Design a protein with these regions (language model features):
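Short glycine- and acidic-rich boundary segments immediately preceding or forming the N-terminal edge
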Residues: 1-18
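A short catalytic or substrate-binding loop motif that flags glycine-/basic-rich loops and adjacent residues
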Residues: 7-10, 146-150
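Core catalytic region of metal-dependent phosphoesterases/phosphodiesterases
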Residues: 16-32, 37-149
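Short, intrinsically disordered, charge-balanced linker/junction segments flanking boundaries
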Residues: 152-155
Length: 155
């Protein structure tokens, strides 16, 4: 059995199965949301510190929405070039969000288990008919990730 087995059990519900090999067995996970990775004010060094710790602890990574900020496109009335990273100022804005995020997260692809969209990604899907979460997950899968893309949900 691989370290993690993932499956969707019903809409909005997902199961991660692992095999315990001793009474003292434990598993670590990095649970994150609202990374807003592409925003100029995001602390990517801290983000990297957390990812490296997940790698060191052999932890799975679960991200539950708004990995992308995606608010700096010319169509968004809230857009501000001050909140835009230099790599997103060169045209192809939506493509650059996926490219930059994938490049940053690919070294951790093998432990990225779950990724779901937040309202930021949902807004892009609604207005521009491109799924940033699925596109980012596809890039991670190309590097061997078992990542499952969840759905937008709340309580």
């Amino acid at each position: 059995m691989p370290k993690w087995e993932l499956e969707r059990t019903s809409p909005g519900c997902y199961l991660i199965t692992m095999e315990a090999d001793s009474p003292s067995w434990h598993a670590d996970f990095l649970l994150s949301s609202d990374r807003h990775h592409d925003n100029a004010h995001t602390d990517q060094r801290l983000e990297l510190t957390h990812l490296l710790e997940a790698q060191e602890r052999d932890a799975g990574i679960l991200d539950i929405g708004d990995l992308h900020c995606a608010m700096q496109g010319k169509w968004d009335k809230r857009a501000s070039t001050d909140a835009c990273r230099p790599e997103q100022r060169e045209g192809r804005y939506l493509d650059s969000l996926v490219d930059c995020a994938a490049e940053f997260y690919e070294p951790f692809a093998d432990r990225w288990l779950f990724m779901s969209p937040g309202n930021h990604e949902g807004s892009i899907l609604k207005r521009h008919e491109t799924d940033l979460t699925e596109r980012t997950a596809e890039r991670l899968r190309a590097k061997g990730s078992p990542v499952i893309v969840g759905s937008y949900a709340g309580f």
